[in-house]
């Protein structure tokens, strides 16, 4: 049996994970995701500091370009939209899997033309020396595992992490939330780690009949502050509670688990 916390690189209070989650049909959760896609894309773009407004995102997703905005900001929004559509197609078709292939496939859409390289782990492409870090404001910087040719350590950590989740975590919500934070902490890619890992989180949730989670734009600062503490302390308890609070059924979840 693989030690869960050791394999993932962080811990959390498992007693605080909700045991009862509102469940729906696959058709229902994918319809909800489709209906809310513009909001999800805008929320995710705001977390990245993208200046596009909600009406501008809506216009762009309708196929109309928005004047006065940087090409890079526009492409980031469009990448988020394409990633959302691909995730939806995978879940609806029963083809979503919690594996490296799906993870890198989604990253190839999320970070296209934005990350140094996209669609594979750090070290699996031509860049084998640069190791990115995560800015933590006044707390300094968080540096993940170094980039090595062929990504042997990142692949080992990823494989062990998935094995630990498979052996120790039955709850779809817990597995989904933990994978998001696992991807954010280990930084398997040069950029777009949190975005891609949240897509994986929502793929796990929707495949289990649970509505997807979006971090509201209004909670961007709160999200960033809590993520800094997560990187510093390697304790995900606070972030788990935050993700529950961001779930569309948050009130019902709280009522059912008290």
Enumerate the language-model features and the residues they cover.
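FIC/Doc superfamily catalytic core
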Residues: 1-258
